[in-house]
């Protein structure tokens, strides 16, 4: 598809491109090919704008009601970035079906991919329906970029997810960043975007649960050493910190002023926002949630194993004020160049670490505890959708 000239006139045209995209990247298994993708809208808590300069006014139902072109541009940018991550994650994980540790896990990753595709579908439906020619162009480009060609918009979504330690850590923590982003968009003054979030959030909960439970099963099995698990936590959580955006972001500042993207805890937070520190505020909420989840894993560690932890927000950062800074993974303390080079070997996965991990996964049948008492993920995929407004 990349390089083709194809103009989208209607959403049906886009659906044809979506079908081609699935086939081209190799994720058109029967369960996926036979799934009925659709656009789902749920209820929003209030019809009034909840924050920013337009607080108290009625939320906007269409683009004509959005006051300025700058605000319309901000909305399309938010939707494009969100949609791009959804399709990227499918591309990142596309080779994992055959290596699933259990049949339940194979069905779980199938469901995760179906729902990520549906989230991308939802964002492209918004673009095509509400944003005219520009929206159609962006919806088309969404299916032309490729994670495995390093073309996705955010760096973490161009990294291969090619083993099940990566997958479980990714779905627990990168998808958890996704939860934060979706929740912030749920409060949007642009009502169609806010209504899109209800079912995306419910579906995202399954993805995070799959990752969190997968890591719990790995820790309980006690075959993969804790120091190796920690390296994968460091890899994906530090990438997730970057996904919250730069410090002192003018984009986040104006998105809040215009009412199109709130704080994660917006309805419960009655304090005046620091408009120049919004991304860091939400990032710190994420860190605290992640740290609590990891502490639970420690309850299942074998005696003598080192405790797991959330890496410091200064570690391994690629954007913001800590980008390129050489800081300790656990304490955040600054290190000199030579010390940091050695430190990274001990705290981030190396080629040798990956080889060890794959040796364990391929040769130790009990590297992960059995999944017990769980329903078939594909049999329950429609349950969160029963009350949706299906358009």
Annotate each predicted stretch with a short phrase.
Residues 132-209, 229-260:
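Active-site-proximal alpha-helical scaffolds that flank and shape metal-associated catalytic sites
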Residues 3-5, 72-82, 101-119, 167, ...:
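Alpha-helical scaffold segments that form or flank carboxylate-/histidine-based iron centers
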Residues 96-100, 185-186, 218:
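Secondary-structure edge/capping motif, primarily at the C-terminal ends of alpha-helices
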Residues 1-107, 129-162, 244-391:
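Terminal targeting/low-complexity segments that flank the catalytic cores of oxidoreductases
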Residues 79, 109, 168, 197, ...:
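Hydrophobic packing residues in well-ordered alpha-helices of helical domains and bundles
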Residues 214-233, 237:
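Solvent-exposed, charged amphipathic helical/linker segments at domain boundaries
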Residues 183-184, 214, 359:
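Domain-scale activation on soluble regions of proteins
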Residues 120-123, 127:
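Amphipathic alpha-helical
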């Amino acid at each position: 598809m990349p390089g083709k000239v194809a103009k989208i006139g209607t959403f049906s045209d886009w659906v044809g491109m979506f079908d081609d995209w699935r086939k081209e990247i190799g994720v058109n298994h029967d369960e996926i090919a036979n799934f009925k993708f659709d656009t789902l809208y749920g209820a929003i808590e209030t019809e009034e704008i909840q924050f920013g300069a337009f607080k108290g006014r009625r939320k906007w139902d269409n683009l004509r009601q959005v006051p300025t072109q700058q605000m319309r541009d901000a909305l399309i940018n938010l939707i494009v970035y969100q949609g791009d991550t959804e399709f990227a994650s499918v591309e990142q994980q596309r080779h994992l079906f055959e290596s699933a540790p259990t049949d339940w896990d194979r069905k779980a990753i199938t469901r995760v991919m179906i729902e990520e595709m549906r989230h991308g579908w939802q964002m492209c439906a918004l673009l095509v329906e509400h944003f005219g020619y520009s929206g159609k162009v962006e919806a088309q480009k969404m299916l032309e970029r490729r994670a495995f060609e390093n073309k996705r918009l955010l760096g973490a979504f161009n990294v291969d997810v090619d083993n099940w330690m990566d997958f479980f850590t990714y779905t627990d923590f990168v998808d958890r960043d996704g939860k934060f982003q979706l929740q912030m968009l749920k409060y949007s003054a642009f009502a169609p975007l806010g209504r899109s979030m209800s079912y995306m959030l419910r579906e995202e909960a399954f993805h995070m649960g799959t990752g969190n439970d997968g890591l719990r099963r790995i820790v309980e099995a006690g075959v993969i050493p804790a120091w190796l698990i920690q390296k994968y936590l460091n890899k994906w959580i530090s990438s997730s910190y970057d996904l919250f955006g730069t410090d002192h972001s003018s984009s986040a500042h104006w998105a809040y002023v215009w009412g199109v993207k709130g704080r994660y805890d917006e309805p419960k937070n009655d304090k005046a926002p620091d408009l120049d520190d919004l991304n860091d505020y939400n990032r710190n909420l994420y860190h605290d949630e992640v740290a609590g989840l990891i502490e639970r894993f420690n309850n299942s560690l074998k005696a003598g194993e080192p405790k797991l932890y959330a890496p410091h927000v200064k570690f391994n950062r690629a954007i913001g004020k800590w980008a390129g800074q050489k800081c300790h993974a656990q304490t955040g303390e600054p290190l000199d160049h030579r010390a940091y080079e050695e430190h990274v070997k001990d705290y981030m996965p190396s080629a040798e670490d990956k080889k060890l991990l794959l040796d364990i996964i391929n040769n130790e049948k009990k590297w992960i505890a059995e999944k017990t008492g769980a329903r078939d993920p594909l049999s329950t995929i429609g349950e969160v959708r029963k009350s949706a407004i299906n358009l």
